[in-house]
Amino acid sequence: MLFSSSLSSSMRHRTLTSSPALWASIPCPRSELRLDLVLASGQSFRWREQSPAHWSGVLADQVWTLTQTEDQLYCTVYRGDKGQVGRPTLEELETLHKYFQLDVSLTQLYSHWASVDSHFQSVAQKFQGVRLLRQDPTECLFSFICSSNNNIARITGMVERLCQAFGPRLVQLDDVTYHGFPNLHALAGPEVETHLRKLGLGYRARYVCASAKAILEEQGGPAWLQQLRVASYEEAHKALCTLPGVGTKVADCICLMALDKPQAVPVDIHVWQIAHRDYGWQPKTSQTKGPSPLANKELGNFFRNLWGPYAGWAQAVLFSADLRQQNLSREPPAKRKKGSKKTEG
């Protein structure tokens, strides 16, 4: 089902200073969360920095703007019914708390990783506050199907177009219209693949449609994905790999970011290069010169043995640092010098 693009009168994106009465906060120091490092690092593809240090996006079928100070995480929620304008409720704050998994002490994890890994210790000094999001399994699955042979900017565009075409319209802020993520029935509908190809998803369009149909027709629906949260890591990974378009790396992304498997270590070319360059790692069970299912498992075990049960979280810190460094290297020297302080925690 395609959703209409007709727009009604819009609200504006809020900032903490423009409408302080509509914000609420959670105690959260920057050492536990850095929004700029977490929301733009390829975990979720639905957040934009609409004004300086204010990130707007969709979470749990609501539109939010987030910002932070040195010790508080602030949020505001835009509700479609203008009669419901007000500060975020306790339930909404709990949704945000769970999304960022704030029950997990990042400071303690960093301390442990630094104690067993001198390279991590040197990197972490400048990249405090990188933690894993706990995402909706359906959104995470189809977002990472779009990630195949892709980069963050292009994935973000694909996911946004998919939501605009097949997701429910939520609210318009300034000139930006926000949509919820499509459900499985919307993605399994007739002509979906053709439409997604027109939207630029290429061969991934077939995988999106086929995986949605497989979950609905062979696995019994979205509850199957939710149930993988209580399955073992190995069981969940194996189950995900039965879906069209899901290989070992995509399955590890979903396990780590949506299915409560903090030991999952997604291996792409970035992580492969980090392992070779910074750890001198070489595969023993495979002669491959790049990521492969067998080598990925071996490398994942290497990092799990090094970092422990939250190995996937530690990998995310190094991935974010490597990504930020690559982005800086592409900037013109003048801009790099001007913005260099922003890369340090």
Curated annotation (Swiss-Prot):
Principal subcellular localisation of the protein: nucleus
GO MF, one example: DNA binding
Role this protein plays: DNA repair enzyme that incises DNA at 8-oxoG residues. Excises 7,8-dihydro-8-oxoguanine and 2,6-diamino-4-hydroxy-5-N-methylformamidopyrimidine (FAPY) from damaged DNA. Has a beta-lyase activity that nicks DNA 3' to the lesion.
Keywords: DNA damage, DNA repair, Glycosidase, Hydrolase, Lyase, Multifunctional enzyme, Nucleus
Lineage of source species: Eukaryota, Metazoa, Chordata, Craniata, Vertebrata
Gene Ontology cellular component list: mitochondrion; nuclear matrix; nuclear speck; nucleoplasm; nucleus; protein-containing complex
PANTHER family reported for this sequence: 8-OXOGUANINE DNA GLYCOSYLASE, N-GLYCOSYLASE_DNA LYASE
SUPFAM superfamilies named in the record: DNA-glycosylase (SSF48150), TATA-box binding protein-like (SSF55945)
InterPro entries, alphabetized: DNA_glycosylase, HhH-GPD_domain, HhH_base_excis_C, Ogg1, OGG_N, Oxidative_DNA_repair_enzyme
EC number: 3.2.2.-, 4.2.99.18
An example Gene Ontology biological process: response to light stimulus
Residues that bind DNA: 149, 154, 204, 270, 287
Family matches, as Gene3D superfamilies: 3.30.310.40, Helix-hairpin-Helix base-excision DNA repair enzymes (C-terminal), Hypothetical protein, domain 2
Disulfide bridges in this chain: none
Keyword RNA-binding attributed: no
Keyword Plastid: no
Annotated binding of 8-oxoguanine, by residue: 266, 268, 315, 319
Active-site residues, as the UniProt record annotates them: 249 (schiff-base intermediate with dna)
Stored Pfam families: HhH-GPD (PF00730), OGG_N (PF07934)
Protein name, per record: N-glycosylase/DNA lyase
Family: Belongs to the type-1 OGG1 family.
Reactions accelerated catalytically: 2'-deoxyribonucleotide-(2'-deoxyribose 5'-phosphate)-2'-deoxyribonucleotide-DNA = a 3'-end 2'-deoxyribonucleotide-(2,3-dehydro-2,3-deoxyribose 5'-phosphate)-DNA + a 5'-end 5'-phospho-2'-deoxyribonucleoside-DNA + H(+)
Domain of life: Eukaryota
Cellular localization per UniProt: Nucleus, Nucleoplasm; Nucleus speckle; Nucleus matrix
Matching CDD domains: ENDO3c
